[in-house]
């Protein structure tokens, strides 16, 4: 069993790279089966705004990297400088740290655990999880729970949603005179909507592809909803735009923003693009009256209050180190399984051979007591031939070591 994690995250790659290797959840099952067919025995894919990671059971992690590049129609060398490949123990520790929020842009954030569980459910339904990854993720979720229960890692955590609100306050001051637009209606937008709603802006509007889901979210925050198709005509109405959809292509183009700014008579517009791939064309941020921030730009704000959680992080790391050691012990026992199986199969062949001989002798009328005696002697000789021959053939230190091992194996204490 060879465990590897291959991936990119917010510390190794900018959003312009991460968006090129991101996966939408609805495409993950097909992607996993495709990865499986390229020599990867087991696989799960975790894809969020901050990371894309492949958890694999494979002899050759290079295959996973090449598959990732080919799947997204990229050259492997284009993403290789941003990728990390973590083998065995490092992969286990990484999974535990990710689920516990220690590897997040927002230290201690809880959202990643739900995202990881969803990734595992998708892999399970796709049939790409085996013994190794099942056990890894079972332990991962257990460790994450232990970390959150026994440390204050999640205390005073500044989420991306909260960071967006703080940044808007830095631009506008109080938010009670602003019109706010949310594009999308997923979990991230829901969190942002709750934070902005608490500041009682002039209006809250949710734009979504399907009106029903948009209306549902809008109702929960005392806002209104609109269709995404109406965005080009209505963008100018809003001072603050927060977007996070699963679109593979930008929803808000440079031209749309230029028209909105002209219609607003160059009144500033604050925009936060939390999507990966990005929802807003980055060129829009170059306009004089547009303050455009991506998920990477929020990093500085979410670092605030980090010092308060460093002690909790150290406690969490200690728990994780201990649990990694436990998992590696399990993994070592699993590596002996093929040998144990082969040993049992060999013993079973000897048993069946001698049993067949005994049955033939009994059928010919031989004395049952003598047949049983011959059977037991033959089995003893067959089963001990290998160890005896190895011990007789060994010399020097090898012989001493082998003798000690055999005494331990057969529990010979005299």
UniProtKB/Swiss-Prot annotation:
The active site is at residue 49. GO terms for biological process: protoporphyrinogen IX biosynthetic process from glutamate. Pathway: Porphyrin-containing compound metabolism; protoporphyrin-IX biosynthesis; 5-aminolevulinate from L-glutamyl-tRNA(Glu): step 1/2. Its EC number is 1.2.1.70. It catalyses: (S)-4-amino-5-oxopentanoate + tRNA(Glu) + NADP(+) = L-glutamyl-tRNA(Glu) + NADPH + H(+). Gene3D superfamilies: Glutamyl-tRNA reductase, N-terminal domain, NAD(P)-binding Rossmann-like Domain. The record marks 94 as: Important for activity. It is an enzyme of class 1 (oxidoreductase). Substrate binds at residues 48-51, 104, 109-111, 115. The keyword Ribosomal protein does not apply. SUPFAM superfamilies: Glutamyl tRNA-reductase catalytic, N-terminal domain, Glutamyl tRNA-reductase dimerization domain, NAD(P)-binding Rossmann-fold domains. One of its GO terms (molecular function) is glutamyl-tRNA reductase activity. Keywords: NADP, Oxidoreductase, Porphyrin biosynthesis. NADP(+) binds at residues 184-189. Homodimer. Possesses an unusual extended V-shaped dimeric structure with each monomer consisting of three distinct domains arranged along a curved 'spinal' alpha-helix. The N-terminal catalytic domain specifically recognizes the glutamate moiety of the substrate. The second domain is the NADPH-binding domain, and the third C-terminal domain is responsible for dimerization. During catalysis, the active site Cys acts as a nucleophile attacking the alpha-carbonyl group of tRNA-bound glutamate with the formation of a thioester intermediate between enzyme and glutamate, and the concomitant release of tRNA(Glu). The thioester intermediate is finally reduced by direct hydride transfer from NADPH, to form the product GSA. Catalyzes the NADPH-dependent reduction of glutamyl-tRNA(Glu) to glutamate 1-semialdehyde (GSA). PANTHER family: GLUTAMYL-TRNA REDUCTASE. Belongs to the glutamyl-tRNA reductase family. This is Glutamyl-tRNA reductase. The lineage of its organism: Bacteria, Pseudomonadati, Pseudomonadota, Betaproteobacteria, Nitrosomonadales.
């Amino acid at each position: 069993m060879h465990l590897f994690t291959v991936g990119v995250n917010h510390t190794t790659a900018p959003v312009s790279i991460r968006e090129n290797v991101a996966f939408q959840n609805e495409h993950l099952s097909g992607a996993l089966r495709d990865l499986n067919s390229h020599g990867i025995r087991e696989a799960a894919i975790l894809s969020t705004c901050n990371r894309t990671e492949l958890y694999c059971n494979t002899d050759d992690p290079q295959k996973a990297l090449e598959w990732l590049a080919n799947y997204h129609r990229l050259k492997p060398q284009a993403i290789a400088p941003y990728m990390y490949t973590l083998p065995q123990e490092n992969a286990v520790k990484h999974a535990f740290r990710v689920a516990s929020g220690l590897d997040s842009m927002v230290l201690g954030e809880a959202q990643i655990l739900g995202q990881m569980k969803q990734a595992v459910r998708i892999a399970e339904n796709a049939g790409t999880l085996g013994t190794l990854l099942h056990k890894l993720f079972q332990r991962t979720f257990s460790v994450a729970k232990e970390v959150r229960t026994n440390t204050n890692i999640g205390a005073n955590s500044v989420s991306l949603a909260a960071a967006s609100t703080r940044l808007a306050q830095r631009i506008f001051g109080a938010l009670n005179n602003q019109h706010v637009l949310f594009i999308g209606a997923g979990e991230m937008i829901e969190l942002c909507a709750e934070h902005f709603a608490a500041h009682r802006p002039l209006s809250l509007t949710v734009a979504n592809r399907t009106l029903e889901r948009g209306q549902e979210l809008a109702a929960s925050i005392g806002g209104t909803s609109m269709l995404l198709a109406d965005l080009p005509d209505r963008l100018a109405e809003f001072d603050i735009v927060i977007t996070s959809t699963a679109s593979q292509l930008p929803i808000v183009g440079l031209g749309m923003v230029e028209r909105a700014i002209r219609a607003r008579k160059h009144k500033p517009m604050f925009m936060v693009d939390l999507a990966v791939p990005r929802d807003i064309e980055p060129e829009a941020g170059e306009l004089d009256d547009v303050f455009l921030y991506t998920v990477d730009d929020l990093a500085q704000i979410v670092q605030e209050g980090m010092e308060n959680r460093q002690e909790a992080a150290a406690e969490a790391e200690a728990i994780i180190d201990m649990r990694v050691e436990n998992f590696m012990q399990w993994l070592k026992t699993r590596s002996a399984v093929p040998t144990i199986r082969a040993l049992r199969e060999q013993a079973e062949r000897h048993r069946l051979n001698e049993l067949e001989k005994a049955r033939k002798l009994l059928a010919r009328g031989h004395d049952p007591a003598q047949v049983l005696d011959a059977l037991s002697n033959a089995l003893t000789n067959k089963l001990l031939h290998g160890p005896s021959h190895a011990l007789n053939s060994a010399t020097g230190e090898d012989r001493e070591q082998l003798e000690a091992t055999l005494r331990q194996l057969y529990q010979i204490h005299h």
